[in-house]
Amino acid sequence: MKELKLAWRYVRRHWWQYILGILALFIVDEVNTYVPRFTGEITNGLDQHTLDMGGVMGLVWKIVLIGVIIAVGRFAWRFFLFGSARSIEKELRSDLFAHLSSLSPHYYNEHKTGDLMARFINDLQAVRTLVGMNVISTFDATVMLLLVLWQMMTYVSPKLTGVAVLPLILIIFGDYFYGKVMHKRFLAKQQAFSTLTDQVQETVSGIRVIKSFVQERKELYAFAKTTLFTKEKNLGVVRLQALVMPLLDLIVGIASLLTLAYGGYLAIYGEINIGQFISFNSYVTMLVWPMMAVGECITSVSQGLASLRRIQEIFDAKPEIVDGDMVNPSIQTLKGDISIEHLSFAYPDQPTVPVLEDVSVHVKAGETLAVLGRTGSGKSTLPSLLMRLYDVTDGMITIDGHNLREIPLAALRRNIACVPQDNFLFSDTLQNNIAFGSDNKSLEAVQEAAKNACIHDNIMEFPKQYQTLVGERGVTISGGQKQRSSIARALMKDAPILLLDDALSAVDTDTERQILDNLRRLRKGRTTIIVAHRISTIQDADHILVLDEGKVEEYGTHEELLNNGKLYASLYRKQQLEKELHEEGGAAHAE
């Protein structure tokens, strides 16, 4: 099974800790089985008057020594086995995080955050139990069972042992069916928990939308349905456990009754003495734990294997964008000469719907290319393809004459600074957010980048200034402030290629003008690609590419495209009209 191979890969790293822990566990179980024997010897000695006080104290001290050995041994096996389980959990979590970080954006489009979080936390805990407590319980129950049975047969009576064990054989047959059913039910339980986690995560992330549309009651009803579904799946596991445990108690109880009846018969007719009878009943009591542990072990194994399967599914997912055979490790620095040749692209989940078709354009190092088009024209796809978040379907993109597949991924992305549409900020200080991705994290450098992005003055108005903590995804600051912070972060990187994907949509025209003036000064020597809706943002670009339904509609400078009188000119006239109407409305409002 793949799942067991995955577990073994981590367990074998700690083999010596497992050996020491199991050895300590064996010693504890071994000395434990001598306590009933010594108790029986004391009983016989006192009953037959063959023991004096010195003999009694000798046996008592042996029992005390056994207690000390058990205490030390229990500490040892807990330290080694539980410690190994925690180490495996930590290693598996780190590897899982690293693997998730390597996966392509397409994977995250198909898998919900809540489901991944459930696997990352809940399933890992089940695996820790599998390689920790379950190892202890399984070995302890097996060894204790064998040692106790050996003592019962050699010290007391093989016949009495057979009678006592006969009902317990039923447990072995029941365990097989119990394990199969429990595995299915626990898998369903974990999947239900993933759905619940995802719904909570989505609700928390979208709470502002929910409140603005007054949908709290609807979301509460939907959450109640999900909670009820999760409860039913949990009860499916609980019901099975509730059924099995009393049955185990019943079988163990029957074994105890048979022991008392047949053991009493043997004692009455002199086949065993009173000390052996008492010892045997103590041994039967010691059998209760191994028998009860069987059910717990099967439950734990079923849960652990189900969780391992869910974790294995993540490891089975392979990153779609990797350094292939074409990669040239010597390419580490780029100048920014970009050539796009007959590029066509469709997203993996919609391979028959082209987003870009036969796009060709060349941008020399240090030049600025603007990309304009209606919503859905495919303009925002270009930055993703340049950073190789996706591979092109047809055609080719080269930088400095190198096919993107020849450039190591890390080197490619290190040479590109990007301001994406969503302007994601981490739940951290503004200083750390702006310095993210930059080697120079000094406050002076951060402030300089913030000034160029026209966000410095706003930051200085905050009580904690650059140490202000932004909320998750930057929700505690405005959209314009998030956008300008993202621009500052890109400027801090100081890369030879700058990508701005609708990076000024949330700022007013005056701030836009200031930022553009700063960018004109800073982008000298840098290749800049600006994706925008507003022509005012891109009219000073060296080249303007106009896309319509994924195809090149026009290409040229601002003046050339206006003279063409096509889509670009039409968009320009509409935006100029909107600007005039807005200014007239503002003037009328002022009067």
Q: Where in this protein do the model-derived segments appear?
A:
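An intracellular "coupling" helix at the cytosolic face of ABC transporter transmembrane type-1 domains
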Residues: 105-106, 122-131, 135, 139, ...
